[in-house]
Amino acid sequence: MAQQANVGELLAMLDSPMLGVRDDVTAVFKENLNSDRGPMLVNTLVDYYLETSSQPALHILTTLQEPHDKHLLDRINEYVGKAATRLSILSLLGHVIRLQPSWKHKLSQAPLLPSLLKCLKMDTDVVVLTTGVLVLITMLPMIPQSGKQHLLDFFDIFGRLSSWCLKKPGHVAEVYLVHLHASVYALFHRLYGMYPCNFVSFLRSHYSMKENLETFEEVVKPMMEHVRIHPELVTGSKDHELDPRRWKRLETHDVVIECAKISLDPTEASYEDGYSVSHQISARFPHRSADVTTSPYADTQNSYGCATSTPYSTSRLMLLNMPGQLPQTLSSPSTRLITEPPQATLWSPSMVCGMTTPPTSPGNVPPDLSHPYSKVFGTTAGGKGTPLGTPATSPPPAPLCHSDDYVHISLPQATVTPPRKEERMDSARPCLHRQHHLLNDRGSEEPPGSKGSVTLSDLPGFLGDLASEEDSIEKDKEEAAISRELSEITTAEAEPVVPRGGFDSPFYRDSLPGSQRKTHSAASSSQGASVNPEPLHSSLDKLGPDTPKQAFTPIDLPCGSADESPAGDRECQTSLETSIFTPSPCKIPPPTRVGFGSGQPPPYDHLFEVALPKTAHHFVIRKTEELLKKAKGNTEEDGVPSTSPMEVLDRLIQQGADAHSKELNKLPLPSKSVDWTHFGGSPPSDEIRTLRDQLLLLHNQLLYERFKRQQHALRNRRLLRKVIKAAALEEHNAAMKDQLKLQEKDIQMWKVSLQKEQARYNQLQEQRDTMVTKLHSQIRQLQHDREEFYNQSQELQTKLEDCRNMIAELRIELKKANNKVCHTELLLSQVSQKLSNSESVQQQMEFLNRQLLVLGEVNELYLEQLQNKHSDTTKEVEMMKAAYRKELEKNRSHVLQQTQRLDTSQKRILELESHLAKKDHLLLEQKKYLEDVKLQARGQLQAAESRYEAQKRITQVFELEILDLYGRLEKDGLLKKLEEEKAEAAEAAEERLDCCNDGCSDSMVGHNEEASGHNGETKTPRPSSARGSSGSRGGGGSSSSSSELSTPEKPPHQRAGPFSSRWETTMGEASASIPTTVGSLPSSKSFLGMKARELFRNKSESQCDEDGMTSSLSESLKTELGKDLGVEAKIPLNLDGPHPSPPTPDSVGQLHIMDYNETHHEHS
């Protein structure tokens, strides 16, 4: 809501009378549009414009950029569908597209175009239809490719509106149809120029029906009389003219010019590409003037005798002078005004209506407008001057006003100064003879001595060389003679041709009824005295020798009547008859005209004045008399071409201006603002609305004319640039020709020097030949010497190769010897390692033998104690036996598993040995391959092998050193543990001996106490022992890391699996609880002895066979063997004694670890 309120405040400030505030608000709107991409702001501006017709809002909307173009087109499309806002929104659309925004190509795909076409098909409001048609005509050159989708819609609109021009509905005012007819005429030109094949096909099919035949005869056929045959009708086809590739090379102004080229109507036609109007045409038509006291040569600029087209119009020349004063640019005899040939200039309605305040314009106004225009063309002060460049090569004028401004400067009525002498009019050049005459208060004419003329002569550089001075003087005399002959002729006014009726006939004839002539004559009689009418000579001027050849059929002007204006005709009447032929923006005093009928001289007429100058003079006089007779006698018999709808519109505007000025003249001067209606009082509302609609239609038509003029100016600027480039290229070519001449001179000089050099070269060649023969003989001698030296070098080379081969063989033998030495060193190190392992095994074996002796003594001691026990312990013994049996079964299963593991380990050993053999074989092959490679690599491989052997020896020494250190650490730890266990066992034995002296009752009590105590003692170190065993196994990874590096076998605890770990746990606990001070060595025939030997032998053999086993692995095997032997020593202890003695408390305390429940708990 705050944003909407802010936008409302900005809109209120948009039409502020303060220019600074208005500019700031406009800048804020543009910034918001750049930052906000939503449609809200655009919709608000469109609504505001429709409500207020604000010009700042219109300026913002016409300068919108992407992506707001879609929002604008959508909003316009929305309002086009509403009848109340259709007219104003179409006017907004016209303003937008006339500026040709960068997104104009999107119009063909926007939904607005179908809506516009639908509106033109369905709407019945003439103002809306006329505005829409002008918008469509303006839009078509921008989106020519849209014809492929909407071509039939364009044709339907033309058919509908052309029928309206004839069969008008009852609710439509007749005056509106003039504007509609002019719009339909422009649409006809656009469709015929862009799509001729399809359009002619439509006309053929549509107007072949009987109901449309009258429309064709009255409306369409007169339009077709004003166009040429389009070249596409001969060379093109329907599909070709709709092909998008046809339009890719054309811009908007190119399309407009292409459409104008095929028009014969001077208001629509273009005179480019070598086309020039024939000099005879202007003799058939009247020329307009602005005052009755004119000189007979005041309107020579209206002749069609000029051939080339300048890129700008005199209507854009602004003369800065005050009323009542004659500007220096007009009075100076050395001044030449920039002008345009009449075929490129149009009569402006603002000249007739008296509009002195045209709309403002954007564009840059040149700072200096009062300088003489002769400076632009480089003319001199006297008579005829040669400009520096043709109008085609002169720079384009800066836009003095807005493109729709029709500059009008009212000159005060003062005394006329007739021309000082007859100036030659060369119809092949764009010349302008202007005499600006000032009328005095009485309207009298000054004496002829004060005549002055201003001449603009174009440079004929692109047309040919100038005629000689004598020919020019002779032609001036002939021209003066013709002018004097014509000045003696007085003509009477011919009877006018009465038209069919009012505006119901769109193409009525050129002349007006006699009553209208009389009315205009009476109305103009109060403005000044009349002068004797003098005919114009410019239309019969001779064509120069450099007249360009006509490229097209000349344009037949639409008002070629034989009527004459009476001597007292006022300005508006003369302008009414020749409305489209006055190029000047100023009101110039008009001459009375002489019509020469519709007859034309033959096209070869101008050749006579070149070949036979004197004969041509008499021929022109005779031809003039014949034309005058024909004009007097056969005025009504001549067929007058139909009037263009544009001229009809111009005449309507002129008649409105006449009526307005007539009513104002009836009123006294102080009351010019009084209501001008015929009956007095306020005009009716319908008349006000009609006038407002007419004003709107006229404004739309002027905007369309502005658009056309913009396109022509753009085209002219392009052509001007091309002409400037052509002139520059010609100058460049001339400079290149001069350079070519200089270079040819240089070439001649170089040729002479070349001959001298060739002679010198021949001498040098002879000298060179003699020198070459001498050098050849020397070369042959040197080649012979070189061959001898080459043979000697070959012999030395062969000797060198033999020496190199011997050295290579000796190096190979040396490498083999080194390999053998390294191999023997490796074998020696392995043997030394095995020897050290065997020594450590022997030491372990001695230690185990000692342990076995100790355990045997302990066993005998236990047997004696059991024999000495009472017989009351039978139940306990039975339970223990049962437990021992179960434990024996478990141990047997463990033994079986151990044997299975042993078998698998043996198989694994065999597999590893086979792998080792394969590896040895591969190593041998690789050694052979390496030897071959060494032969090729030579020095580099030898150095690499030496480094490799040295590194290998170092790593072997380091590994042996590391393994030795790990073995020492493990031995030291094991010895310390054994010493601690021996000390504990000795203390326990002494305690048990003390307890044996007590009684039976005391022994039972002590037995229970010690059992509980030993349970606590054995349970407490159990976690530590478990931690120690697991730590030795887990941390044994660190101690046995070297063995893992040297052999691929897994550690013993990883190979054994869960059974081995459980076995080691139980054995570790059992060995920890068994005293080591008592017992004897088991016999070799007992189960324990055999099992111990088998295990020891297997372990030792596998340890000796595995080359990669280290000392840490041997130590781990020793500890496991000790544990196994400790457990197996207990098993036959219980089995060999079939008559156990009653256990002592010490024995009970020592055997509690074998309890079934406890062992079962530990295994679980």
Curated annotation (Swiss-Prot):
- Which InterPro entries did the record assign? Hamartin
Q: Where is the composition biased (Basic and acidic residues)?
A: 474-487, 1007-1020, 1155-1164
A GO-annotated cellular component: protein folding chaperone complex
Segments for region (Disordered): 439-571, 1006-1085, 1131-1164
Q: Where is this region: Mediates interaction with WDR45B?
A: 403-787
Substituting residue 133 to I results in: In TSC1; uncertain significance; no effect on expression; no effect on subcellular localization; no effect on inhibition of TORC1 signaling
Q: What is this protein called?
A: Hamartin
Organism phylogeny: Eukaryota, Metazoa, Chordata, Craniata, Vertebrata
